Amino acid sequence: MQASRHSIQAEPGWYVSAQQPEEAVAADEWSPLLSNEPHRQGSSGASFGLSVFNVMNAIMGSGILGLAYVMANTGILGFSFLLLFVALLASYSVHLLLAMCIHTAVTSYEDLGLFAFGLPGKVVVAGTIIIQNIGAMSSYLLIIKTELPAAISEFLPSDHSGSWYLDGQMLLIIICVGIVFPLSLLPKIGFLGYTSSLSFFFMVFFALVVVIKKWAVPCPVTLDCINEVFQISNATDDCKPKLFHFSKESVYAIPTMAFSFLCHTSVLPIYCELQSPSKKRMQNVTNTAIALSFLVYFVSALFGYLTFYDKVESELLQGYSKYLPHDVIVMAVKLCILFAVLLTAPLIHFPARKALMMILFSNYPFSWIRHSLTTAALNAIIVVLAIYVPDIRNVFGVVGASTSTCLIFVFPGLFYLKLSREDFLSWKKLGALFLLLTGAVVGSFSLVLIIFDWVNK
């Protein structure tokens, strides 16, 4: 059985039919990506828990702030179905990626593209990863730029307008130089496991505060509700939750959710540093991370929507800034969510830098100078984008509709159909085809509608 497994890894294709089905499944579940991984025999490598935190940190970023707005434009049941649907598809696409990596003996998303379609496939995948992750990091830093000055000013006893520490652009540059850049310079993604755990607990605290503050804002929502606490919501038409709803704004639903569940570019680097790595163990890491992220997403979106209903902002924190500007708990949770978003940026930076260096310097040995210069260049790009992109929804919609849907749905399905030698009517190939078609339809349709909406405005 061991020899059979290595023969599969050595071939430039899939030869699953050479094994009995039950033997192939057993090999898939416990096969490592590489037959020679020294760290598997020792105690080095990231633990299961830290790996879960890293995957959750890759999943949970600024997307959590836009989901209440999505629920307001799709309804509670509509949102629940769509969120569950995208989460299941995200988990299944990771399953396909891990299966392909086992049978092709490659360790990166870009190399899967190379294995399937040659050099053009590698370049397309790497370019998609770079664009998507730059868009994600820009949206994270955009939140820092817009929200951090207001969060700081709320703790100040008097007016300090004009001060450098209330200048969003200045704070953004300082944070990128002092925090994001040093963390991004770390050579291994596993080093960020502890900062990822801190980021996740900040997100959980945010969700709990959203639940508690549902009763702090009376309904109907008016500016007179400032400083009111624990008011009972009135049963008016404005305060009745919608189970299903569709409007022009609903077009942002799927792209925003796809953006919120994207962890695929970080899964393989995290897998390579996992203790006792196997396909089954990494799938369990991913499923645990997606399930916990789904829970936090749903709770924060539901109670955020039930707080503001149709008046919910596209960025949830803006609503609390407007109606509860001096609430101490809200002031604290703003800083927590900002730090959580900030700590996500370095994790997303790793796949972007790796993709860029695989395109430009794939034949060169590792160099700290090249590593540092590439990191600095990427940080400079995302700072510029964060300064000049005015609306976070633009980032969510366009990036989610184009690159995120490719990385979650299109590429895993397409590569599996290309590389697998299973019968076309097998369940996995049909699932891969469904994944591919879903991504192509959803991504194209959403992108067209978003552009059409912009033109009308």
Swiss-Prot record:
Role played: Amino acid transporter with an apparent selectivity for L-glutamine and L-glutamate. May facilitate glutamine uptake in excitatory neurons. The transport mechanism remains to be elucidated.
PANTHER family: AMINO ACID TRANSPORTER, SODIUM-COUPLED NEUTRAL AMINO ACID TRANSPORTER 6-RELATED
Tissue expression remark: Expressed exclusively in neurons and not in astrocytes and glia cells. Highly expressed in the synapse. Highly expressed in glutamatergic neurons. Primarily expressed in excitatory neurons, with some minor expression in inhibitory neurons.
Organism: Mus musculus (Mouse)
Modified residues (Phosphoserine): 4, 7
GO cellular component: plasma membrane; synapse
Key words of the record: Acetylation, Amino-acid transport, Cell membrane, Disulfide bond, Membrane, Phosphoprotein, Synapse, Transmembrane, Transmembrane helix, Transport
GO molecular function terms noted in the UniProt entry: L-glutamate transmembrane transporter activity; L-glutamine transmembrane transporter activity
InterPro entries (UniProt xref): AA_transpt_TM (IPR013057)
Pfam families in the record: Aa_trans
Residues where N-acetylmethionine is found: 1
Transmembrane regions: 48-68, 70-90, 112-132, 171-191, 192-212, 251-271, 289-309, 328-348, 372-392, 395-415, 432-452
Name of the protein: Solute carrier family 38 member 6
